[in-house]
Amino acid sequence: MEDLFNALPQPLQQLSLALAGEIPLNDELFQAAASTWHTRQRSETYHLLDRLRFSTPIVTPQAIYRDLPWRNCYRINQDRVERIPTTNASDDVYVPNSDISTLLSPLFSIPTYGTLHPSIEKDALELRADSARCASTFYKIASSQARQVKLDPTRMLEFLLLLVATPRVNSGLDTDQPSMRDPTKSPALHAIWQIMQYYKVDSKYHAPALIVSTGAVWWIPPPGKRNVVSVQYLLTDLVNLAIIARMTDMHPTLGLCAARVYIQAATTDSYTHTLLKLKGVFPALSIHSMYRQKGFGGKAPDIQWTEPRTKYQFKWVGVTHLHDGLRPRAPVRDEAVRKLLTEYQLADIMAPIVEMRNQHKHHDHDSVRFVRDVMALTSGMYLVRQPTMSVLQEYSQVPDIKQPIPPSAWTGTVGNVRYLNKDVTGPARWLYNTWREAAQEIAQDRTWHDPVNQFIMGSQYVTARGGSGSSLKHSLTVTGLVLPEFSESSVKRSSKIYQAAQIARIPFTLLTAAIHAEVVMAIRNQVQRRARSIMPLNVVQQAVSAPHTLVANYINKHMNMSTTSGSVVTDKVVPLLLYASTPPRTVVNVDIKACDASITYDYFLSLICGAMHEGFEVGDNHASFMGVPSSIIMDKRSALAPYSRTVSGLQTMVQHLSQMYANGFRYSVTDAFSSGNKFSFPTSTFPSGSTATSTEHTANNSTMMSYFLAVHAPQHIKSPNMKRVLSDMTIQRNYVCQGDDGVLLLPDEAASKISAEDMDELLTCLKDYGTSFGWVYDIDWSDSAEYLKLFALCGCRVPNVSRHPPVGKEYASPTTDEIWPSLIDIVVGHHLNGVMDLMNWREWLRFSWAFACYASRGAYTDKYGETHIAQYPWWTFVYLGIPPILLPGQTPFIHSLFMPPGDQAMFAILNNWRDLISTNTTTTFPPLKHPHHTWHLADVPTLLDSYGVYAGYHAAQHPRRPVAQPETANSESIEQITGALTDYLLYDPILKARVNTGRHNWSQLSQSIGLNIGGRVPSLMDVPGKWVAAGREAEKPPPSAIVYMFKSLNRTIRRPSKHFSKLLELYIRVKVVLGAPKPLAIDPDIPQVAGADPHNDDPWFKYVGLGDIPTSTRRYFGESLFVGRVVSGLDVEAVDAALLRLKILGAPPAAYIALLNGIGMSNSEANQIAGRVSLANAQTVQIGRVVNLSTPSSWMTLDTAPYIQYHTYDFKPGVTNPSAQSREKFIWLSPILKLLCATAAMSIAGPVREAYVLDIHGSAASLSGNFREWMRAA
């Protein structure tokens, strides 16, 4: 690649060498490369491709430049701009492959590029001209589709070429295999080069679009050429494919198949619609059709699901030796795929994939890597659709209920609800009884009579996110109610925080009109799925939804025991997926199509509201709930003797909830992508923005499956074998679901798989059953497991790489102007995705550093024309979790991607570098006059300062969002909104009294000199201020705040203090050494995660050394907490750490009670929790939190707990300095030292090794004293 290297400017050549491990990275090199990139024209990247002599069979036809006139794709209907399908598919409503050039007006700064002509937008807005409105819609939605990227794809392409330009240095590990595939054989790169020849004018390349901070600007071609928008999307997908192919070491044949699909999509009427139709091709040819030939073999784990199953704990008990008797029974998908591909003239791409697939008869590292690579071929583009079309298509659906509930099934009305008659049977009765019994349990549970638990429920939707605030205000204004305004507080007006403050002092009885307010549209773009419109409810609607959430949570936790919602995929029972996919088990993936639209008042919601209301009858009918008082309703169950009666606050909420569901919602649509598209749309679809949505769908999903397994299937299945299987099945043991997604686990049938005929009968029965109540079950039986977009095959997790595209990023709003430092967080998130997806780690690390270099530099021009520039040092990214490639004096690529971020990263680096920098310091700088607390007389701080370590360290902790400045808000308005939120929080006098008592008692105790337990603990009174701060941060920052951020960041970088945080200074007093590799936890021949194999050595070492985590991480970390739930705005882990801190500091029981009272807990609950706080029984992760040590997300799928317990040593006789041994009274110090040992070991590439504390500078006693001093000041 010498030609390519020579074509780079000198600063980028130096960066290329550093990324290869030839030379250490330093700030001078880093900043010069970043500066070069930011002044270098993007078109230069395509000239670099000229240096590669490609030799691939890829051909890009001229048909990709054909023009489907945009005028043929849009129309005005009912005064709305709507997309007209140009094919027979009704969902063909995505961006058309049309020429955009005729709509452009040249930019002054770049005349060859342009944006929408002002006259078109003016005619669309002012004259409402049909043609102009259609043109404007096409331009805006096409530009939005182009903008769904982290960065201009051209820049990402150049990062890749920088890696290719210099071969990587061998790291020295025996397993390092530096040979990578030749880039001249890359079909993706070759296709990019071919396409760009069309965009080459006068020897200069012009990308179809340039992505800028505010969106996209489009090339204005010379006469005779077009600029078809789909070519930009095609280039984005090809760049993404080229990166993934390099990072996975993908076979070029597979890359060719993907490139063919993308190119063919560009020749159709709509690129994105075609990709949506073809998204299932590559999974169908790989994970859904593996191992169907005779000769099946290999090894899989033997996993047991331990009792009780509700804990979701699993155990590896050995190896399953695979054979033909365990071969998958589900049919291959080849014929269906062939038919689909033939429709798009792509049938020939099937043969090479099938041929490669059939070579993998054994389940091993190579076969699962093949599966991972084929699945990665699916386009990872975020798909954009005109919001108007999302609403018209998604919110007009009505379920087809084959067996509706007859009017005779109901009693007379009880206010706004009806109860189900006793003689009704079938799934309706089963559903009704489940919800009624759960409601009874809630009504009788004294826990929910406690105001703090009620407010925990009521605080979960008080966030900085928007939620139909304007319609809330309008609905109340109509009734004559004037809401207070806090306009000068700078809190985002559309946020639910602002709404909560507005209604804080208004009785619920005056707010009921807001329950029927319109719901304002929001939008989400997704990968490989249609764009989704969201219905965010206002705070009053969310409040009356609380009983729905509460009862559903009870059903999920105590009755059906399904998984509950959460945002991190590793919280979603990964071990369950591995267990389910391991032969001889049979697993069926069950999804409910259009679940929101299928949950309507005609069936589900009328049953649920009636059942909850009846169940709540057992409670106190005069009791209020969440500030909602009891009320009087008319009970007409007896037509002859109707009567009025009092119902509780919970029942009153259900009355309003039932009326809200019965009326349906009016969806207020303001389509920012379509000029003039503002309309109100009635819908019966369940509101996707409700806090109840996920948990209520889960409860219904599991309840209906419960009836199927217990009653319906045994009555309708004919097969004796299947009847026997069903007799042992329950949802608690055999069905796990969340929302509309489920996994059905069929028990082993005498150590062999259930026959295909029996499976077909069962699945047909399930589909027919769903139609009786309006559900369409989308059933996938492929002998692989899929749950919540996670995949597993024969006990091996298969990362779905295409779901985390290196290039792609969602931008749902048409205004996408972001403040630059946010790109730093995008880099870090992008890096972590590659770690979790098991990319080839050294190449991924190189790519991450190239991206980090570009992102490290930013500029902002203020209104006076002054440009402010800031440049992050390279050590900033080390602190944020990207390991260095090469440090002075070390071997390249010795630091692992499993290195934690933050102070733990710095400890790991400095611990490993300690001896080298100490030696370098003594030969470079004079000794210190006074001994340093860690480095003795060596002036290591000056050396670290010269390396830029301190500058990068402190810059990393500088805010990357402009901080709301005091002068940007009126202090009186801030006080008013804070006071209103305080009243919203402490609405209950009992809760208010507890908090005040707790604060008073804590104040008395903390001021006691004899106790010396510190002065700061979490309190409910912190919450209003945190809400205000979050609301202000969500608002678009003023220019003055942006300028201040740039200036403040530059001050931090230029004049950093020559020390770390107090905690890190204490960490580095501990010297950790690594011993021999620990014994393997897993047979190295068993694939655990596709991509963690000898070709990708460090992840493989970590997985075989530690094994998969055997339990749900959510449950593991949840059970390590003394306090289960706290009010939104408080950090449950911070409360937990504060309790342990008090234990370490020897605080009396009264201090725990005061702290817990201060967060709203009663004396009885506080006493129970205080009694559980024990250092002896605390888990390592709990004590680690006290001093800010944590388990990073990259460890979450690994079984690190046994390693930390048995293979890290805070004291090793004969190895550890005796003064470093902690005394028995310092029992809490041992877990901290063990976590530091684990941090050091996991941060080194290679086998997982035992780790020991060699020495502690000063002694263990002095270190514990310093930690306690820090705790008092924290």
Swiss-Prot record:
Catalytic activity: RNA(n) + a ribonucleoside 5'-triphosphate = RNA(n+1) + diphosphate
Top EC category: transferase
Signal peptide bounds: none
Localization of this protein: Virion
Record-linked Pfam families: RdRP_5
GO MF entry, a single one: RNA binding
Keywords carried by this UniProt record: Hydrolase, Nucleotide-binding, Nucleotidyltransferase, RNA-directed RNA polymerase, Transferase, Viral RNA replication, Virion
Domain RdRp catalytic: 550-798
GO BP terms: viral genome replication
InterPro entries for this protein: DNA/RNA_pol_sf, RdRP_5, RNA-dir_pol_reovirus
EC identifiers of the protein: 2.7.7.48
GO CC field: viral nucleocapsid
SUPFAM superfamilies assigned: DNA/RNA polymerases
Major subcellular location class: virion
Protein family (similarity comment): Belongs to the reoviridae RNA-directed RNA polymerase family.
Function per UniProt: RNA-directed RNA polymerase that is involved in transcription and genome replication. Following infection, it catalyzes the synthesis of fully conservative plus strands. After core assembly, which consists in recruitment of one capped plus-strand for each genomic segments and polymerase complexes, the polymerase switches mode and catalyzes the synthesis of complementary minus-strands.
Stated name of the protein: RNA-directed RNA polymerase VP2
Encoding gene per record: S2
